Amino acid sequence: MTKLTYYTATTLDGFIADHNDSLDWLMRQENDEDGPLNYTEFIEGIGAIVMGSTTYRWLLEHQPGEWAYEMPAWIMTSRELEMPGAPADVRFASGDVRPVYDAMAAAAGGKDLWVVGGGELAGAFADAGLLDELITYTAPVTLGRGRQILPRRILPAAWPCSGI
């Protein structure tokens, strides 16, 4: 069964991006490829991804060159995006996340789905009852303000705690 995971990093004070929507704090963190949050192992099981337009724009602007993802990607946006040089397998969508989930699941070829970011988008999937798993890495950093990991109340959480 395909599952949707919000796999993300957060600061000690609960932010995924700073007040300028930057992920620079995250790019300075070491990645433990042998630990429980092994990205390489995680991404091998992913068949489609979804992210908000702010995450998408940041990735294009700050990681120029070849698109980092080989699987189909959906970009959720409430505004018109003009992105010259957008990767070939990127689709833009807005509104209800349910049809996007269905399209992602169909395209994933039996693999899992990943909410890359941000927190508001992950919350929309949770509100729709579609978010199956939350995996977080907490970095030893504080930002004081910025984009929250989940900027809304989500109850009841049916996610078991598998490690701290």
State each model region's role.
Residues 1-164:
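Enzymes that bind and transform nitrogen-containing heteroaromatic metabolites
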